Amino acid sequence: MDGTRTSLDIEEYSDTEVQKNQVLTLEEWQDKWVNGKTAFHQEQGHQLLKKHLDTFLKGKSGLRVFFPLCGKAVEMKWFADRGHSVVGVEISELGIREFFTEQNLSYSEEPITEIPGTKVFKSSSGNISLYCCSIFDLPRTNIGKFDMIWDRGALVAINPGDRKCYADTMLSLLGKKFQYLLCVLSYDPTKHPGPPFYVPHAEIERLFGKICNIRCLEKVDAFEERHKSWGIDCLFEKLYLLTEK
């Protein structure tokens, strides 16, 4: 392992305010799906999660797992296939339908009575439910508490000005002895406006530190050729485990 590229103590960028006023609307996110601008989707699933999954699950079954801003993440099926109950929220109906189609899962849809004009999509097996609505409306549905949250591509996509509201929503969904798995990206925010946005360690502490123990499990070089178009020359991904204090 190259200690200068994957160690957990790489210096973070000091200009953390440069992206604070960046805003993407829900309509702009929906347009990304319509126009196929979904390079954030990982067809093979997230490799850090795959690496640590069995350690996190510890042989348990029947856990409730929440996927914020789930898109069509294949990891949802990983958990469902291991006997867990998966709930996701995604603003794009297209993304949700693509998930069920690509995973060859039959499903039904029904209105979310608490949020007029929205739907929930449920697998025929009953262990995957995907809510098509804003994540900030989700608490109105009384979906209950979760044992685990897999947050990859969610906190980094939320408008920086909405992070406190987002974090409070996530914390309100956590049950006892929870595991909150969080992936964030580290790059020079003066070179790329986001999303995905740069989320430094201090921001995670600010958002979750009063309630959670915070541990960075791994930091890996995530730079790909496509990231050159962002104007950056390095990109790291960090996997955090947040647990109950």
From Swiss-Prot:
The keyword RNA-binding does not apply. Keywords: Acetylation, Cytoplasm, Methyltransferase, Phosphoprotein, S-adenosyl-L-methionine, Transferase. GO terms for biological process: methylation; xenobiotic metabolic process. Its main location: cytoplasm. S-adenosyl-L-methionine binds at residues 29-40, 69, 90, 134-135, 152. It catalyses: S-adenosyl-L-methionine + a thiopurine = S-adenosyl-L-homocysteine + a thiopurine S-methylether. GO terms for molecular function: S-adenosyl-L-methionine binding; thiopurine S-methyltransferase activity. Substrate binds at F40. The keyword Aminoacyl-tRNA synthetase does not apply. Its EC number is 2.1.1.67. It comes from the Eukaryota. The modification Phosphoserine is found at S14. It is found in: Cytoplasm. One of its GO terms (cellular component) is cytoplasm. Monomer. Belongs to the class I-like SAM-binding methyltransferase superfamily. TPMT family. This is Thiopurine S-methyltransferase. The lineage of its organism: Eukaryota, Metazoa, Chordata, Craniata, Vertebrata.
